Amino acid sequence: MVCLSRENFAVEGKRKGTPCSSLGAMAITDGRFNEAQVIARLKEIFATSDPRISIGIGDDAAVVTGGPNQILTTDMAVSGVHFRTDWSSAFEIGRKVTAANTADVLAMSAKPDFLLVAVSLTGSETIEWITDLARGIKYEADLAGAHVVGGDISRAGQLVISITAIGSTNKPITRSGAKPGDGIYLSSLTGWSAAGLAMLNSGSTEVGEPAEKALSEFKSPTIDYGFDASNSNALCDVSDALVIQAAQMAEASKVCFNFDLTKIQASAEFVELEKVAQKLNADIWSWIFAGGEDHALLATGTDLPGLLIGEVTQGAGLANVPAGVEANTWQHF
C-alpha cells in the first residue's frame, strides 16, 4: 500500500491548507460559490470504485496499491505561458494539462494509474468553469485509465494547474537504449500543435478537417494510448520538439539519429498538415521538427507500430534534419 500525500503551502502567508486528498485549502467565497460547493462537485466528478484505491478524496491523504515499478512525474501549467483562457475552454485546458503528465508516464513504457491535481484559482472563475476544468481532467484521465485520488485548491494572482502522475510498469524503457540498426518511429506525426498555434496567432479563419485538427491538437492534444512501445529499445515523449528530444536520445544512447524525410512525406498526415502550412505560408518542416507541444512518442526498435521516420546509425547527433530548422519551443529561462 502506498500513501500519497503532499504538504500544502501556507495560504496567503496566514494558515496551512488541508492536506492533499481533501482537495481544499482556503475558502473561496465571492457570493457565487464557496469552497465546500467546489469540493463536493469535484468529489462527484472524480468518484471511483477502483479496488486499488483504499482511501481516495476526502481524507488527509490517499492510500493506493501501486504496481511493480512505480513511475512518478509532475508537470505544471501556467495561464499565459502554457495555455490561454481566451483561446481554450476549461474542458480543453483540463485535457491538455492532464495529457502532458500521462504522456510522460507512457514515455517510460508505463501505464498511468493515479493523479494528484493542485490548482490555484484567481477568484474570477465561475463554478461552471471549475467544473468544466475538472471534467476535462477526468475525461483525459479516463482515456489513460488513471484516477484522480487527491489534490489541492488555493487562491493566487494567476491560474496555475499542477498535476503529479503515478504509473506502473514491468519494464521501464529509457532514452538511452537506442542501438545502431534500430528504426526510428513516431506514434503519430508531430507538427499539428504548432500549426494550431500558428493559426491562432495569425487570426486565421481557415476551415476544413486539417485546420480543425490543428486547432484541436493545440488546445487538447490527442494521445495514442494504445500505442504498444513495450518492444522499444529507447522511448521518449516529444513535447519539447522532435529535434530537441531526438538529440537527447541520441546523446544518451551514444548514437546518431538519421532521419528519412521521404518516409515522413509519404505519410497521410503529412499531406493533411501540408495543406495548413500552405494556407499560412509556413515551413512545415519547422512545425514537424521544432514546433513542440505534441505528445507523440518517439521510439527506436524493430518492426514497431507507428510512423517509421529514419534509422539509428553509428556516430553522434542528428543527420538529415531539414535545412533551416531551429528549435523554437518555449524556454522558461
PLM region spans:
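Helix-biased detector of long, well-ordered alpha-helical tracts
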Residues: 20-333
